[in-house]
Amino acid sequence: MTWTIQLMAWYKIHKRSFPWRKSRDPYKIWLSEIILQQTRIAQGTPYYQSFIKNFPTVEALAAADEQQVLKLWQGLGYYSRARNLHHTAKAIVSDYNAVFPKTFTELCTLKGVGNYTASAISSICFDEPQAVVDGNVYRVLARYLGKDTPIDASYALKEFKALASELMGTESPGDFNQALMEFGALQCVPKNPLCDNCPFQKDCVAFNQNRIGQLPFKKNKIKVTDRYFNYLVFVTPDAKTFLSQRTAKGIWQHLYEFPLVESAQLLTFEELAKDPILFKYTDMNAAVLSKINEKPIKHKLSHQQLYITFWKINTEQLLGVVIDENKIHNYPVPIVLQKFIENFYTLKT
């Protein structure tokens, strides 16, 4: 029995049922793949269902307001995915008459669609023999074949895609891709893989050389940067406050937030009270500043560790464009701010 036949036999038994697996509609496959990037399936599935309910077609997504898309995406993180999703939906409607490109090469021209996503769509929806390479595929092949190639090296994708392509064949490439990823997600998992009942144990190089814990190999560790955010939550007798949209490139672009003072370290009450930016929003001589959370909230991103402190400023009058507190839930905000808003304004009322 060949390796591929064994894999497909395993998949037939262990294949999980997901809503996007019931369709070969490229819109649904594309949507699921974008949502599930950097996201666990259990977390991503409700978002997929919500997007399909609100935007059942690519035309519906293209016609949506960006704020609607970001609000629906709220909590998934990596918000550039949502912006690219919306941009690409518009491009498919305007440039392709709402019909998805069918080839890997064409799909790669779409914003936010890389090698992996283009391979998934072209193979699952259009039977193009394009091998997908994700973390699961790297892990399964690196262990089975005993590959020491650093998977974060620039040449790793090409090498592992070629290896997967050799195993794939030309029959049902979409099923093969899903089977290989499923095997990595359920059987050949990162820690404590199920080697005892693995159909490939006999020929697995990593198992036979006792190197399961060493493969796949990465040469670089992500450097994590510490950042200190101080959010200013203004409170007035007439229930007004400030929110502004992040426009700069970086984390949370196009999402909304309270006025922010970013510092090099945790700020004391005295240090923040002296910051001239506070006077941009109100007369601080007639305002009362207080710390809401005594200990900073730690919020981990892929390459950044945020330490967030919320400060309340009670004042009679605000300067500039304000919003009503009762409308604050309408704005797309980072999940850490969403949790704060839900707690703070519930307690306040």
Predicted regions and their residues:
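Intrinsically disordered, low-complexity, charged terminal extensions of DNA damage-control enzymes
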Residues: 1-16, 22, 185-349
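Catalytic cores of DNA base-excision repair glycosylases
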Residues: 3-194, 200-209, 213, 279-282
